[in-house]
């Protein structure tokens, strides 16, 4: 595994960085209690939005992390107000015909249940798990990401779903119904069989045959091109395999973690924050994606719990080096109400070869803020994950 000489963020420095982030979250509470936070900033300031985006769960996660650190009831009250909104959303099926139930309901409602015993949070999260199960395709054994169920042009999954299926592992734990975890395992097995290339890089999306259920081809939506490696997709691969190993202890998941991590590390620039696609490694004006660094740091710190001491020490050091770079060069230290926590994220960059709509390029992105805080929290204590 590749190693680096970058500065390691110490525990006191992580605590200071976390407290700086929490101060910004506190300042933003009035803006995002009765509204949600947009998926990405505009000139570093997040517009308000209704609770109808796939990213709306990350801001409540930041608020819960702030509550964990401070014990301040102001954070708890805002987060519980948001739980009401998430329960309403899933009960009324508002923009939930997609696979992103984990991103929405784990950091908002599972967190609420774990931290406060909120029955509304538990109910909303179980309903969200039920909704995710409706996306499961028996032919191919995967959760269809987008579009009309069964439609040939959308008969595919995306690697991001590795962070959605933990909602199902949790649902099995809390209800005693193994069906949720069984579907999660089937999806992860399909994903790891098809989405990881021989060199450890990953496809963003993967099409399956709606008639036979067999694999068809990998493709990108938000990466540079089909055969490149979208940085955030690779990051989802790192963290998602670590979480699936946490719930299942299946050795093939840990093997996959090591493979995707090794590729990710080989393609990093000097400051350990990747460009938005890993086809770019240095000497380019292409934008970075700071969110990927924080996501991978979370995966490293989760995996460190389940490996030998030497390997765990390597993972912890790597995570602290990545977070040291983000904290020093990308994190916001102060700013007006509405400002994000981490600059230089990339939501969706158009290229001549991809199909995405350009949004949130070189901006703060809501998941980047959340995973930065989660990773810092992991460095400061033995954290019970929301996923």
Model-based region annotation:
Residues 1-387:
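Glycan-recognition and catalytic cores of secretory/periplasmic carbohydrate-active enzymes
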């Amino acid at each position: 595994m590749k190693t680096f000489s970058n500065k390691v963020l110490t525990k006191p420095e992580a605590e200071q960085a976390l407290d700086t982030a929490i101060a910004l979250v506190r300042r933003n509470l009035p803006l995002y209690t009765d509204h949600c936070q947009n998926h990405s900033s505009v000139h570093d300031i997040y517009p308000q939005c209704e609770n109808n985006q796939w990213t709306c769960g990350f801001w409540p996660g930041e608020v819960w992390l702030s509550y964990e650190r401070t014990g301040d009831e102001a954070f708890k009250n805002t987060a519980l107000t948001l739980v009401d909104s998430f329960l309403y959303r899933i009960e009324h099926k508002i923009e939930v015909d997609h696979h992103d139930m984990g991103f929405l309901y784990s950091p908002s409602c599972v967190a609420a249940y774990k931290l406060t015993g909120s029955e509304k949070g538990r109910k909303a999260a179980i309903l969200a798990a039920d909704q995710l199960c409706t996306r499961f395709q028996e032919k191919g054994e995967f959760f269809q990401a987008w579009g009309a169920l069964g439609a040939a042009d959308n008969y595919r999954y995306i690697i991001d779903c590795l962070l959605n299926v933990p909602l199902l592992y949790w649902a099995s734990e809390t209800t005693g119904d193994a069906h949720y975890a069984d579907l999660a395992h089937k999806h992860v097995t399909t994903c790891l069989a098809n989405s990881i290339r021989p060199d450890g890089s990953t496809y963003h999306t993967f099409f399956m045959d709606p008639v036979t259920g067999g694999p068809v081809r990998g493709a990108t939506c938000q990466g540079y091109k089909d055969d490149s490696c979208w940085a955030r997709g690779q990051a989802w691969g790192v963290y998602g395999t670590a979480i699936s190993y946490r719930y299942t202890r299946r050795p093939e998941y840990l093997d996959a973690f090591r493979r995707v991590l090794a590729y990710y590390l080989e393609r990093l620039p000097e400051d350990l924050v990747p460009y938005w696609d890993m086809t770019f490694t240095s000497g380019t004006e292409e934008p970075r994606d700071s969110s990927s660094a924080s996501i991978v740091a979370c995966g490293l710190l989760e995996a460190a719990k389940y490996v030998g001491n030497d390997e765990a020490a390597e993972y912890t050091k790597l995570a602290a080096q990545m977070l040291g770079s983000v904290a020093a060069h990308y994190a916001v230290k102060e700013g007006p109400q509405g400002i994000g926590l981490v600059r230089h994220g990339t939501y969706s960059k158009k290229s001549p070869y991809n199909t995405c709509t350009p949004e949130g390029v070189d901006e703060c992105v809501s998941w980047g803020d959340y995973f930065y805080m989660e990773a810092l929290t992991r460095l400061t204590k033995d954290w019970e994950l929301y996923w």
